[in-house]
Amino acid sequence: EADRAHPQKKSRPLAAGIVSTQVAWLAAVLLPTLALAAAYSLHQGLFWVLLLYFVLQVAYSFSLKHIVLLDILVVAAGFVLRVLAGGVVIEVQLSPWLYTSAGLLALFLVIGKRRQEFSTLGEAAASVRRVYAHYNLALLDDMLRIVTTSTLITYILYTVEARTMVRNGENLGLLTVPIVIYGLLRYLYLIHVRKEGSAPDEILLTDRPLQATITVTALAYFVIIYLL
């Protein structure tokens, strides 16, 4: 019902009545079961990570999304588990700072989305997300400032620790820091000035400067690790 009141989510298949509740429940049981079976056949470690991810998503859907602060922390934790799953599959021990950076970046995007959604919906926000009754713009802005700073600091620590980025005694990974700073500031600009941000995935698909930021960062890593 809450999705039907949301200006964007109301077009989702279940909210729009395109998919019945029975079909949705069947898919909710069948698809995770198939995914877990495939994960177990690929790597037992991946199975346990994926199982934890599904448990977290179920807990979020039925309870945690209504608890202030936990509603955003759980979403960010889901992204960390995805990074962990990647590390498990390729059997590489990833840096703790990478997990921290990924989690904080996810938190940055989630808070930005919540902030823009809350600002756009106004008094109707609580009818779309019950938890919005416990938020206000001042709190969301303070959280966004803290997480933005923390994201940048942990990313710098990750690049400093990354030995794969060191060439001739110089840590070339630090060259990517200005690019990341620009990306974070660009996203804040889109939230506060352009009043976008309610759908981070759409922004990443439509905003050319952000696309360029991601592309340049990926190319920088490729060149430093594989060509230098």
Predicted ranges, named:
Residues 1-15, 70, 111-119, 186:
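Acidic (Asp/Glu-rich) catalytic motifs at the cytosolic membrane interface
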Residues 4-50, 96-107, 142-148, 208-225:
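Multi-pass membrane catalytic core of lipid/isoprenoid biosynthesis enzymes
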Residues 25, 68-78, 204-210:
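Cytoplasmic-side transmembrane-helix entry/capping segments in multi-pass membrane proteins
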Residues 31-33, 54-57, 75, 79:
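Residue-level recognition of pore/gate-forming positions within transmembrane alpha-helices
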Residues 48-52, 66-76, 97:
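Hydrophobic alpha-helical membrane segments of integral membrane proteins
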Residues 49-61:
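Internal transmembrane alpha-helices of multipass membrane proteins
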Residues 62, 80-228:
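C-terminal membrane-associated helical module and adjoining short loops/tails
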